[in-house]
C-alpha cells in the first residue's frame, strides 16, 4: 500500500487497543477534534530536536533480514526502519514501511533508541532467569526498575515515543505521564471489552511507575541531559541466572510463556482435587457444583476439544444433523449457508452426521491487497468417511464483482478449502456463481474441513486493491442484554460477512477485575451497507429518549481501516444509563457510521427489548443446583403460577384395545417387565405404539399390554389385535387408573437421583404446597407440621414438604419403607404435572445409566454416537487426577457428561431418548440390561403416561390445566 494510504489510515492519531476495536475514550485524553489534526511525520522527522508526535506507530529497526512466506507478511532487510501499529498478535506485529504494510516477526526487530533498560548494544541480556515465566514477568515490568525514585510527570522532547497526548497506544486506556501512587484515580480507568482470548491482563507494580504494561516500546523518560542507567533492583530475577539470552530468544520466550496463561477466559476453571476436602461428601458436592459451572460456561478454545462442556448456549452459529442414505440438506441457522447431500451418499443403513459452524474471524492468509474474504470460514465435520458421493456447499457471500468488463476480467470469486483453520488453503472449483450466491462441490472429504469464499485478483497491481473491483458489504450488528436496566452496556460489532450470531459472549475486563466471567448478549438488530474501501470508520450511537443517554465521552468509537482490510470482527462498547430508573421503558437507538471525513456512510435504528417484568420470572433453562443464599429468592415459573391442580380420579381405563394371544410363552429367566401368557387368552393393549428392545437373541418390537393383573411387554408377533371389543377369554381384574399408576411406577425406586436438582425443579414449578402435600398423603396437615419457622415464600414451603417426604422415606423405624422417587412421581402424576415428571424421569435415567455403565461408558458411547477416541479422551480430561488417570469410582462422571450431551442431540422427545438409550445398551457385549432390567420398566412408564392422563382426568377439564 502506498505511503499516502498509510497516512490516511493513521491520520486520526487514535490508538489501537487489543479488543479488536478502538475502545479508548475519545474525549478524556485527546485534544483532537477531527480526523485531520495529527500530522504523520517522515522517518527523518524523528531525528530533529523537536519531533512531531508519532501518535499510533512505534518505530523499530530490523536486526536481521526477513523474506515473507506468504502475501500477508512484510519483507524487510537488516537496518530498515519500520513502524509498528499493533502488537496484540504476540509473535507477529502489524507494521508498515514507506510503501506497504503487513505482519512482521517481533523477534526480527528492535525498538529504536531503546536506552533505558539493561539491553546492551550487542543485543544480549546477561543473567536472565531459566524460567520462561520469570522472563515474561520481567518483560511485563520493563521500565519499572527505578524503585521508588520520583520522576516529574512532564513531557521530554528528547524521546520521540513520549507524545503530548499522554497515551500509550499499547496500553488499554489513557494513563497520565508518570503519576505518583497517591495520584492514581480508579475512576479514570477505561473499561474495555476483551473478546480475543489472547489478550493479557494489566499488570501493576507498587514499586514501579505505572506507565508501562509490558510492551518493550514503552520507554521510561529521563531528565534532560541524563543518560545514565537508573538503579536496578537487586531482587530482579534477571540476576539469579548465569544464562545469557539474545533479544530474539527473549521474544520467543515471552510469546511461549504468555500463551498458556492468556489462552482462554477459563484458565482458572479447574476441577477440584480430592485432597482439598476433608470428607468425600464435601468433594462430591464441590465436584457437582464445578461441573454445573463448567457446563454453563463457554470456552471457545475448549469447546471443540471437550464436547461435554459448553452445551448450554452456542457462541458461534452452528448445527449438528444426522442424515441417512436418503440424503437431504443441512442449513446453518439464521444464515444463507447450506450443504446438500445427494441420495446414496452413504450405504443403506449407514448414517452421516454433519456438523457446521461459522467462524467469525478469517485467518490472515485470506485477506491482502489482492484477496478479500467475503464469507465466514465454515467448519464442516463429518462422522462417516465411507461415502459414495461428494457434497455440495451453497452460500450467500457479502460481495459482488462490479458490473464492468475490466472488473469481471480482473477479479473472480474463489472457494478455498483447508484441513486447518489457519491454512494453507487450496482452491475448489465453483459449480456456479450467480450474483452473491455461489455453489461448490466438495470431493475427497475429510473428518474436518474449513471452507471460505474470497474475491481474488492475482494480476492486480499497486496501487489498486481488490476492493476497487467489488461491491463489498459489511454488516453492523447491535448486541445488548436480554432486558434493559437502569444502566447497561451495548456492543456494536462490524463483520466482514453477513453471518451475525444470535448470541455474543463477551468479557468485560478492567484493571480491577482482569478475569471476569463472560456475559451473553443478544442480537438486537443488524444492518448491511456497501463499503468502497477499507478505511477508518467512526461509529456513533444516540438514544431517541431523554431518559436514556449514551455518555457524551462514549458516543463515538473508531474502527481502524486495517482491521476491516484483514476481515477481523470489531467490537465497540457503548454504556447507556437512565436518568430516572423508576421510569424504565423500551426505546430506540440510532447507530451512525461515518468515514474519516465525517460523512455519514449509513445509519439505522434498533428497538431495544422491554425492561424485565416486575415479577422477575426466572429463566426457563434448567437449574440443577442452588446456592444457600438463593433458596429464599426462588420465583415460580410462568407455568406454575397459572396451574390449577385437578383431582385424580380412580376409574377404569376405557381407551384400551384388545388382542388374542397366538402363542404360549413361559420364560426361564424371569423378568418383571416381560409378560408370560397362554395361547388363546385375551390381552388388553394400552396402545398400538411399539417399543423396541432386545429379546433373548435379537431386537424385537413389543406392545405394552395388561394381562392377568400385570402390565408388561408382549411380542407383537404373538398378538392378533381384534379391536376395542373385550374378548370373552380376557381374564383377570379390570385395569383401573390406580392399578395402572402402581404398576408403571415399579422401576422408579431403582433409579438414582440428585436431591438438590429435584428440590430446585419442584421449587420452581409447583405453585401450591397444600396441593403437593395432599397428593403425597399429608392431607389437612398444617404448615407447622413440615417446618418450625414461618416461611414467607411458596417455593420454600414446597421445599419443606419435600424435605418431610425425604425424612419419612429414610426413617428406618417406619414399618412400611417408602421409596422417595416412587412417592414423589406418584404425587406429581396425581397433580397432573406430567411435564415435570418426564423431566425428572429422564434425569434419573441418564444418571442411573452413567452409574451402572461406569467403566464401560466408552463402549456405550461408540454404540450410541460413534464417538472417536479423541472425543472420549476429551470427556474424561476434566476428571483426571494429577497422574492423568480417572479413578474407577469417578468413571460415572464422564459417562454422565456424555449422556447429557448425547440426549441434547437427540432432541426434546423423552421417549426417543430412553428408547435409543435402551437400544444402545442392548448392543453392548454382555449388555447390562440383562441384569439391570429397570430401564425396560422406565420405557413402559414413559409410554403409558398419555393413557393414564386421559383416563384419570376428565376430558371436560383438560383445557384448563397446564402440563
Swiss-Prot record:
SH3 domain location: 55-114, 654-724
GO-annotated biological processes: cellular response to amino acid stimulus; endocytosis; negative regulation of cell growth; negative regulation of cell population proliferation; negative regulation of GTPase activity; negative regulation of TOR signaling; positive regulation of autophagy; protein localization to lysosome
Post-translational changes noted in the entry: Phosphorylated upon EGF stimulation. Phosphorylation prevents interaction with DNM2.
GO MF entries: GDP-dissociation inhibitor activity; identical protein binding; small GTPase binding
Entry GO CC: clathrin-coated pit; clathrin-coated vesicle; cytoplasm; extracellular exosome; nucleus
Modified sites of kind Phosphoserine: 131, 246, 251, 279, 296, 637
One Pfam family linked to the record: DEATH_SH3BP4
Subcellular localization: Membrane, Clathrin-coated pit; Cytoplasmic vesicle, Clathrin-coated vesicle; Nucleus
Keyword terms, alphabetized: Coated pit, Cytoplasmic vesicle, Endocytosis, Membrane, Nucleus, Phosphoprotein, Repeat, SH3 domain
UniProt note on tissues of expression: Expressed in all tissues tested with higher expression in pancreas. Expressed by retinal pigment epithelial cells (at protein level).
Residues annotated as domain ZU5: 317-454
InterPro entries: DEATH_SH3BP4, SH3-like_dom_sf, SH3_domain, SH3BP4_C, SH3BP4_SH3, UPA_SH3BP4, ZU5_dom
Function: May function in transferrin receptor internalization at the plasma membrane through a cargo-specific control of clathrin-mediated endocytosis. Alternatively, may act as a negative regulator of the amino acid-induced TOR signaling by inhibiting the formation of active Rag GTPase complexes. Preferentially binds inactive Rag GTPase complexes and prevents their interaction with the mTORC1 complex inhibiting its relocalization to lysosomes and its activation. Thereby, may indirectly regulate cell growth, proliferation and autophagy.
Additional remark text: Overexpression or depletion of SH3BP4 result in a specific decrease of the transferrin receptor endocytosis that can be rescued by DNM2 overexpression.
Subunit structure: Homodimer or homooligomer. Interacts with DNM2, EPS15, clathrin, the adapter protein complex 2/AP-2 and TFRC. Interacts with the Rag GTPases RRAGA, RRAGB, RRAGC and RRAGD; the interaction is most probably direct, preferentially occurs with their inactive GDP-bound form and is negatively regulated by amino acids. (Microbial infection) Interacts with molluscum contagiosum virus protein MC159L; this interaction is important for the suppression of autophagy.
Domain notes: The SH3 domain mediates localization to the clathrin-coated pits and vesicles. The SH3 domain mediates interaction with DNM2 and the cytoplasmic part of TFRC with a lower affinity. The SH3 domain also mediates interaction with RRAGB, RRAGC and is required for the negative regulation of mTORC1.
Protein name, entry field: SH3 domain-binding protein 4
Source species: Homo sapiens (Human)
Amino acid at each position: 500500500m502506498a505511503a499516502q494510504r498509510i497516512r490516511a489510515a493513521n491520520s486520526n492519531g487514535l490508538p489501537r487497543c487489543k479488543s479488536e476495536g478502538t475502545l479508548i475514550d475519545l474525549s478524556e485524553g485527546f485534544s483532537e477534534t477531527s480526523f485531520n489534526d495529527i500530522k504523520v511525520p517522515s522517518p527523518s522527522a524523528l531525528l530533529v530536536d523537536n519531533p512531531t508526535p508519532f501518535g499510533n506507530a512505534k518505530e523499530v529497526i530490523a536486526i536481521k533480514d526477513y523474506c515473507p512466506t506468504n502475501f500477508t507478511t512484510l519483507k524487510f532487510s537488516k537496518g530498515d526502519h519500520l513502524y509498528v501499529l499493533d502488537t496484540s498478535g504476540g509473535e507477529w506485529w502489524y507494521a508498515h514501511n514507506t510503501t506497504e504494510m503487513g505482519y512482521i516477526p517481533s523477534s526480527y526487530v528492535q525498538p529504536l533508541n531503546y536506552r533505558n533498560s539493561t539491553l546492551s548494544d550487542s543485543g544480549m541480556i546477561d543473567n536472565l532467569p531459566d524460567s520462561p515465566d520469570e522472563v515474561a514477568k520481567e518483560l511485563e515490568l520493563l521500565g519499572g526498575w527505578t524503585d521508588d525514585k520520583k520522576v516529574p510527570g512532564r513531557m521530554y522532547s528528547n524521546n520521540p515515543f513520549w507524545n503530548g497526548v499522554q497515551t500509550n497506544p499499547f496500553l488499554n486506556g489513557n494513563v497520565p505521564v508518570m503519576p505518583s501512587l497517591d495520584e492514581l484515580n480508579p475512576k479514570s480507568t477505561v473499561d474495555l471489552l476483551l473478546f480475543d482470548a489472547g489478550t493479557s491482563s494489566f499488570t501493576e507494580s507498587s514499586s514501579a511507575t505505572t506507565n508501562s504494561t509490558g510492551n518493550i516500546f514503552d520507554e521510561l523518560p529521563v531528565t534532560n541531559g541524563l543518560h545514565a542507567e537508573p538503579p536496578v533492583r537487586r531482587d530482579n530475577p534477571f540476576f539469579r541466572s548465569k544464562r545469557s539470552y539474545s533479544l530474539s530468544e527473549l521474544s520467543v520466550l515471552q510469546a511461549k510463556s504468555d500463551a498458556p496463561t492468556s489462552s482462554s477466559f477459563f484458565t482458572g476453571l479447574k476441577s477440584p482435587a480430592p485432597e482439598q476436602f476433608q470428607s468425600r461428601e464435601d468433594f462430591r458436592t464441590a465436584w457437582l457444583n464445578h461441573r454445573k459451572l463448567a457446563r454453563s460456561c463457554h470456552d471457545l478454545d475448549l469447546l471443540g476439544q471437550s464436547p461435554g462442556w459448553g452445551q448450554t448456549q452456542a457462541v458461534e452459529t452452528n448445527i449438528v444433523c444426522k442424515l441417512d442414505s436418503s440424503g437431504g440438506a443441512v442449513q446453518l441457522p439464521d444464515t444463507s449457508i447450506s450443504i446438500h447431500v445427494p441420495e446414496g451418499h452413504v450405504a443403506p443403513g449407514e448414517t452421516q452426521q454433519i456438523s457446521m459452524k461459522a467462524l467469525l474471524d478469517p485467518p490472515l492468509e485470506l485477506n491482502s491487497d489482492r484477496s478479500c474474504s467475503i464469507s465466514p470460514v465454515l467448519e464442516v465435520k463429518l462422522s462417516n468417511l465411507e461415502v459414495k458421493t461428494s457434497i455440495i456447499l451453497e452460500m450467500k457471500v457479502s460481495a459482488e464483482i462490479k458490473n464492468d468488463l475490466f472488473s469481471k476480467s480482473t477479479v473472480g470469486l474463489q472457494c478455498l478449502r483447508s484441513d486447518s483453520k489457519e491454512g494453507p488453503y487450496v482452491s475448489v472449483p465453483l459449480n456456479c456463481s450467480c450474483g452473491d450466491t455461489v455453489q461448490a462441490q466438495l470431493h475427497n472429504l475429510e473428518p474436518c474441513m474449513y471452507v471460505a469464499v474470497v474475491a481474488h485478483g492475482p494480476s492486480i497491481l499497486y496501487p489498486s486493491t481488490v476492493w476497487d473491483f467489488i461491491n463489498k458489504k459489511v454488516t453492523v450488528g447491535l448486541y445488548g442484554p436480554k432486558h434493559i436496566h437502569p444502566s447497561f452496556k451495548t456492543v456494536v460489532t462490524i463483520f466482514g460477512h453477513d453471518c451475525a450470531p444470535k448470541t455474543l459472549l463477551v468479557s468485560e475486563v478492567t484493571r480491577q477485575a482482569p478475569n471476569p466471567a463472560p456475559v451473553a448478549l443478544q442480537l438486537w438488530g443488524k444492518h448491511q451497507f456497501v463499503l468502497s474501501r477499507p478505511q477508518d470508520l467512526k461509529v456513533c450511537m444516540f438514544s431517541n429518549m431523554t431518559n436514556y443517554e449514551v455518555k457524551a465521552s462514549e458516543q463515538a468509537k473508531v474502527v481502524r481501516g486495517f482491521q476491516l482490510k484483514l476481515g477481523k470482527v470489531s467490537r465497540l462498547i457503548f454504556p447507556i444509563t437512565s436518568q430516572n430508573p423508576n421510569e424504565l421503558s423500551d426505546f430506540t437507538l440510532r447507530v451512525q457510521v461515518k468515514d474519516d471525513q465525517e460523512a455519514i456512510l449509513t445509519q439505522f435504528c434498533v428497538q431495544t427489548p422491554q425492561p424485565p417484568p416486575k415479577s422477575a420470572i426466572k429463566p426457563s433453562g434448567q437449574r440443577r443446583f442452588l446456592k444457600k443464599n438463593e433458596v429464599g429468592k426462588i420465583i415460580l415459573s410462568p407455568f406454575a403460577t397459572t396451574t390449577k391442580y385437578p383431582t385424580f380420579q380412580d376409574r377404569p381405563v376405557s381407551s384400551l384395545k384388545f388382542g388374542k394371544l397366538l402363542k404360549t410363552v413361559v420364560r426361564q429367566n424371569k423378568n418383571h417387565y416381560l409378560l408370560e401368557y397362554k395361547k388363546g387368552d385375551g390381552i388388553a393393549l394400552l396402545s398400538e405404539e411399539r417399543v423396541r428392545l432386545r429379546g433373548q437373541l435379537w431386537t424385537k418390537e413389543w406392545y405394552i399390554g395388561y394381562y392377568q393383573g400385570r402390565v408388561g411387554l408382549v411380542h407383537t408377533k404373538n398378538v392378533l389385535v381384534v379391536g376395542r371389543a373385550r374378548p370373552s377369554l380376557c381374564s383377570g381384574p379390570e385395569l383401573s387408573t390406580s392399578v395402572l399408576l402402581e404398576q408403571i411406577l415399579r422401576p422408579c425406586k431403582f433409579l438414582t437421583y440428585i436431591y438438590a436438582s429435584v428440590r430446585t425443579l419442584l421449587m420452581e414449578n409447583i405453585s401450591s404446597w397444600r396441593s403437593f402435600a395432599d397428593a403425597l398423603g399429608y392431607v389437612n396437615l398444617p404448615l407447622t407440621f413440615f417446618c418450625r419457622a414461618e416461611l414467607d415464600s411458596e417455593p420454600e414451603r414446597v421445599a419443606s414438604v419435600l424435605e418431610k417426604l425425604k425424612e419419612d422415606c429414610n426413617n428406618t423405624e417406619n414399618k412400611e419403607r417408602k421409596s422417595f422417587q416412587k412417592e414423589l412421581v406418584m404425587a406429581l402424576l396425581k397433580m397432573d404435572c406430567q411435564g415435570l415428571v418426564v423431566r425428572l424421569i429422564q434425569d434419573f435415567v441418564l444418571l442411573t445409566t452413567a452409574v451402572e455403565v461406569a467403566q464401560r461408558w466408552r463402549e456405550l458411547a461408540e454404540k450410541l454416537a460413534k464417538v472417536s477416541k479423541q472425543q472420549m479422551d476429551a470427556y474424561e480430561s476434566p476428571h483426571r487426577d494429577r497422574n492423568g488417570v480417572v479413578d474407577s469410582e469417578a468413571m460415572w462422571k464422564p459417562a454422565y457428561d456424555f449422556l447429557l450431551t448425547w440426549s441434547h442431540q437427540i432432541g426434546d422427545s423423552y421417549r426417543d431418548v430412553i428408547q435409543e438409550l435402551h437400544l444402545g445398551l442392548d448392543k453392548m457385549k454382555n449388555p447390562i440390561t440383562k441384569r439391570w432390567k429397570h430401564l425396560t420398566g422406565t420405557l413402559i412408564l414413559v409410554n403409558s403416561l398419555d393413557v393414564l392422563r386421559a383416563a384419570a382426568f376428565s376430558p371436560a377439564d383438560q383445557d384448563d390445566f397446564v402440563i
